[in-house]
């Protein structure tokens, strides 16, 4: 939607990812955009909240692509709500991934008593394209050490490993 040079886009993405608001403001102020667009870029990464946040996003300048992204988030929320997970969903527009293969929504999973993500993932349709197999994909990674730490902090039993298993695959 915004016409931004690749170097500026990468610098802005890095500032948002590191939550460096001062640097983000400097980068945005130097962009050849309207004041309204600059304000929107500065505000979006700071937005987070529940379902009502999605409605607020429609007030921002948007393109067909951003409108589609909001619609996608609303659909994901409806599905999660239908499974009874609405109390556990919070939208944070400041979460972005460093990898260029992500193509849609990204997420992080948290547990009570743990101040950092237990898992993270998202939609990454470009990942397999990098290996010559274009295909849509969604997935996540779960931090085993973080899972064990969460179990320990919540008074759960941390099982002792009994056997090591190795799985290999090849053609």
Model-predicted segments: where are they?
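Positively charged, Gly/Ser-enriched RNA/tRNA-binding surfaces
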Residues: 1-10, 23-171
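Short helix-adjacent coil turns
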Residues: 18-19
């Amino acid at each position: 939607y915004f016409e931004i040079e690749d170097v500026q886009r990468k610098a802005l993405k890095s500032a948002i990812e590191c939550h460096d608001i001062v640097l983000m403001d400097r980068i945005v102020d130097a962009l050849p955009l309207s004041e309204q667009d600059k304000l929107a870029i500065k505000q979006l990464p700071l937005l987070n909240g529940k379902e009502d946040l999605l409605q607020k996003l429609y007030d921002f300048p948007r393109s067909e692509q951003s409108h589609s992204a909001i619609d996608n988030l609303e659909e994901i929320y409806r599905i999660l709500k239908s499974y009874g997970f609405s109390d556990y969903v919070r939208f944070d527009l400041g979460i972005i991934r460093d990898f260029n293969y992500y193509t849609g929504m990204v997420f992080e999973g948290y547990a009570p008593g743990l101040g950092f993500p237990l898992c993270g993932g998202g939609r990454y349709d470009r990942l397999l394209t990098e290996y010559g197999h274009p295909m849509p994909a969604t997935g996540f990674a779960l931090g085993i050490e973080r899972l064990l730490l969460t179990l320990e902090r919540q008074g759960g039993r941390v099982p002792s490993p009994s056997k090591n298993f190795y799985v290999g695959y090849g053609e």
